[in-house]
A protein has these predicted regions:
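Domain-level signal for Mg2+-assisted phosphodiester chemistry and nucleotide/NA-binding surfaces
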Residues: 1-92, 102, 132, 138-142
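Short glycine-/acidic-enriched loop or helix-start segments at secondary-structure transitions
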Residues: 21-22, 58, 122-123, 145, ...
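Short loop/turn motifs at secondary-structure junctions
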Residues: 42-44, 106, 153
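Active-site histidine-anchored catalytic micro-motif
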Residues: 105-148
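Short, structured coil segments at secondary-structure junctions
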Residues: 67, 129, 150-153
Protein backbone atom coordinates (compact mmCIF):
# COMPACT_ATOMS: atom_id res chain seq x y z
CA UNK A 1 0.00 0.00 0.00
CA UNK A 2 2.72 2.48 0.95
CA UNK A 3 6.12 2.92 2.54
CA UNK A 4 6.52 1.89 6.17
CA UNK A 5 7.77 5.41 6.89
CA UNK A 6 4.53 7.00 5.65
CA UNK A 7 2.42 8.79 8.22
CA UNK A 8 -1.22 7.93 7.74
CA UNK A 9 -4.61 8.09 9.39
CA UNK A 10 -7.75 5.99 9.12
CA UNK A 11 -11.05 7.81 8.67
CA UNK A 12 -13.98 5.45 9.10
CA UNK A 13 -17.51 6.42 8.10
CA UNK A 14 -19.07 3.97 10.58
CA UNK A 15 -22.54 3.52 9.07
CA UNK A 16 -21.11 3.30 5.54
CA UNK A 17 -18.51 0.68 6.52
CA UNK A 18 -21.11 -1.36 8.41
CA UNK A 19 -23.51 -1.30 5.46
CA UNK A 20 -20.71 -2.27 3.07
CA UNK A 21 -19.58 -5.21 5.22
CA UNK A 22 -23.22 -6.30 5.64
CA UNK A 23 -23.70 -6.20 1.85
CA UNK A 24 -20.69 -8.52 1.58
CA UNK A 25 -22.06 -10.83 4.29
CA UNK A 26 -19.71 -10.24 7.21
CA UNK A 27 -19.11 -8.17 10.32
CA UNK A 28 -15.96 -6.15 10.97
CA UNK A 29 -13.63 -7.17 13.78
CA UNK A 30 -12.28 -3.73 14.68
CA UNK A 31 -9.36 -5.12 16.67
CA UNK A 32 -8.23 -7.06 13.58
CA UNK A 33 -8.84 -4.03 11.33
CA UNK A 34 -6.55 -1.86 13.46
CA UNK A 35 -3.92 -4.61 13.57
CA UNK A 36 -4.11 -4.96 9.77
CA UNK A 37 -3.19 -1.32 9.23
CA UNK A 38 -0.53 -0.98 11.95
CA UNK A 39 2.11 -2.44 9.62
CA UNK A 40 1.39 0.02 6.81
CA UNK A 41 3.39 2.92 8.22
CA UNK A 42 3.16 5.26 11.18
CA UNK A 43 -0.50 5.36 12.18
CA UNK A 44 -1.31 8.84 13.46
CA UNK A 45 -4.94 8.21 14.29
CA UNK A 46 -7.81 5.84 13.63
CA UNK A 47 -11.08 7.73 13.85
CA UNK A 48 -14.56 6.21 13.73
CA UNK A 49 -17.41 8.60 12.86
CA UNK A 50 -21.00 7.75 13.67
CA UNK A 51 -24.34 9.41 14.32
CA UNK A 52 -25.97 8.54 17.65
CA UNK A 53 -29.45 8.71 19.06
CA UNK A 54 -29.17 10.63 22.32
CA UNK A 55 -29.66 8.52 25.42
CA UNK A 56 -29.13 5.25 23.57
CA UNK A 57 -26.24 3.04 24.71
CA UNK A 58 -23.85 1.77 22.04
CA UNK A 59 -21.38 -0.89 23.21
CA UNK A 60 -19.40 -0.66 19.95
CA UNK A 61 -18.67 3.03 20.51
CA UNK A 62 -17.52 2.32 24.07
CA UNK A 63 -15.31 -0.56 22.91
CA UNK A 64 -13.74 1.45 20.08
CA UNK A 65 -13.02 4.36 22.42
CA UNK A 66 -11.22 2.03 24.85
CA UNK A 67 -9.27 0.12 22.19
CA UNK A 68 -7.23 2.54 20.12
CA UNK A 69 -9.84 4.45 18.14
CA UNK A 70 -10.86 8.07 18.41
CA UNK A 71 -14.65 8.13 18.25
CA UNK A 72 -16.51 11.13 16.87
CA UNK A 73 -20.25 11.11 17.40
CA UNK A 74 -22.96 13.41 16.18
CA UNK A 75 -26.49 13.47 17.52
CA UNK A 76 -29.14 12.64 14.93
CA UNK A 77 -31.65 15.35 14.14
CA UNK A 78 -35.26 14.91 13.12
CA UNK A 79 -36.79 17.23 10.56
CA UNK A 80 -39.71 17.45 8.16
CA UNK A 81 -38.79 17.60 4.47
CA UNK A 82 -40.46 19.74 1.79
CA UNK A 83 -43.11 17.08 1.15
CA UNK A 84 -44.02 16.85 4.84
CA UNK A 85 -42.27 13.54 5.59
CA UNK A 86 -40.32 13.07 8.80
CA UNK A 87 -36.65 12.42 8.17
CA UNK A 88 -33.62 11.82 10.33
CA UNK A 89 -30.41 13.65 9.51
CA UNK A 90 -27.48 11.41 10.35
CA UNK A 91 -24.47 12.35 8.26
CA UNK A 92 -21.01 12.69 9.82
CA UNK A 93 -19.35 13.90 6.60
CA UNK A 94 -18.67 17.43 7.86
CA UNK A 95 -16.91 16.19 11.00
CA UNK A 96 -14.86 13.71 8.98
CA UNK A 97 -13.89 16.38 6.43
CA UNK A 98 -12.86 18.93 9.07
CA UNK A 99 -10.68 16.38 10.87
CA UNK A 100 -9.08 15.20 7.62
CA UNK A 101 -8.22 18.76 6.61
CA UNK A 102 -6.77 19.41 10.09
CA UNK A 103 -4.48 16.37 9.71
CA UNK A 104 -3.63 16.90 6.03
CA UNK A 105 -0.39 18.71 6.83
CA UNK A 106 0.81 15.87 9.05
CA UNK A 107 -0.02 12.77 7.00
CA UNK A 108 1.32 11.29 3.80
CA UNK A 109 -1.67 9.03 3.23
CA UNK A 110 -5.34 9.09 4.17
CA UNK A 111 -7.19 5.78 4.34
CA UNK A 112 -10.90 6.50 3.95
CA UNK A 113 -13.48 3.82 4.66
CA UNK A 114 -16.52 5.14 2.79
CA UNK A 115 -18.24 5.02 -0.55
CA UNK A 116 -20.12 8.29 -0.13
CA UNK A 117 -19.74 10.43 -3.24
CA UNK A 118 -20.28 13.51 -1.08
CA UNK A 119 -16.71 13.05 0.15
CA UNK A 120 -15.16 13.54 -3.29
CA UNK A 121 -14.43 17.22 -2.63
CA UNK A 122 -12.61 16.24 0.55
CA UNK A 123 -10.50 13.71 -1.36
CA UNK A 124 -9.62 16.37 -3.94
CA UNK A 125 -8.74 18.90 -1.22
CA UNK A 126 -6.34 16.61 0.66
CA UNK A 127 -4.77 15.49 -2.63
CA UNK A 128 -4.04 19.14 -3.47
CA UNK A 129 -2.11 19.23 -0.19
CA UNK A 130 0.02 16.28 -1.29
CA UNK A 131 -1.81 13.54 0.60
CA UNK A 132 -2.35 10.25 -1.22
CA UNK A 133 -5.81 8.78 -0.66
CA UNK A 134 -6.59 5.09 -0.30
CA UNK A 135 -10.30 4.39 -0.43
CA UNK A 136 -11.84 1.25 1.07
CA UNK A 137 -15.34 0.20 -0.05
CA UNK A 138 -16.70 -2.33 -2.55
CA UNK A 139 -17.85 -2.75 -6.11
CA UNK A 140 -18.70 -6.41 -5.42
CA UNK A 141 -22.23 -5.67 -4.17
CA UNK A 142 -25.28 -4.89 -6.28
CA UNK A 143 -25.51 -1.99 -6.48
CA UNK A 144 -21.88 -1.07 -5.71
CA UNK A 145 -21.46 0.58 -2.31
CA UNK A 146 -19.14 3.24 -3.72
CA UNK A 147 -19.89 6.24 -5.89
CA UNK A 148 -18.04 5.91 -9.19
CA UNK A 149 -16.71 9.48 -9.06
CA UNK A 150 -15.23 8.90 -5.59
CA UNK A 151 -13.53 5.70 -6.69
CA UNK A 152 -12.02 7.43 -9.73
CA UNK A 153 -10.72 10.29 -7.58
CA UNK A 154 -8.83 8.08 -5.11
CA UNK A 155 -5.15 7.27 -5.66
CA UNK A 156 -5.73 3.67 -4.60
CA UNK A 157 -8.96 1.69 -4.29
CA UNK A 158 -9.09 -1.37 -2.03
CA UNK A 159 -12.16 -3.56 -2.25
CA UNK A 160 -13.34 -4.47 1.25
CA UNK A 161 -13.92 -8.06 0.13
CA UNK A 162 -10.12 -8.39 -0.31
CA UNK A 163 -9.66 -7.47 3.36
CA UNK A 164 -12.44 -9.77 4.57
CA UNK A 165 -10.22 -12.75 5.49
CA UNK A 166 -8.06 -10.50 7.66
CA UNK A 167 -10.64 -8.19 9.27
CA UNK A 168 -13.87 -10.17 9.56
CA UNK A 169 -15.24 -11.17 12.93
CA UNK A 170 -15.33 -14.86 13.72
CA UNK A 171 -18.93 -16.11 13.53
CA UNK A 172 -18.83 -17.46 17.11
Amino acid sequence: MNSVSDRFALFIDGPNLSATARALGFDIDFRRLLREFHGYGRLLRATYYTPVIEGQENPLITWLDQNGYTVVTKATKEFVDASGRRKIKKSVNVELAVDAMDLAGYMDRMVLFSGDGGLRSLVQAVQRRGVRVTLVSTVASQPPMIAAELRRQADVFVDLRELRPRISRDPS
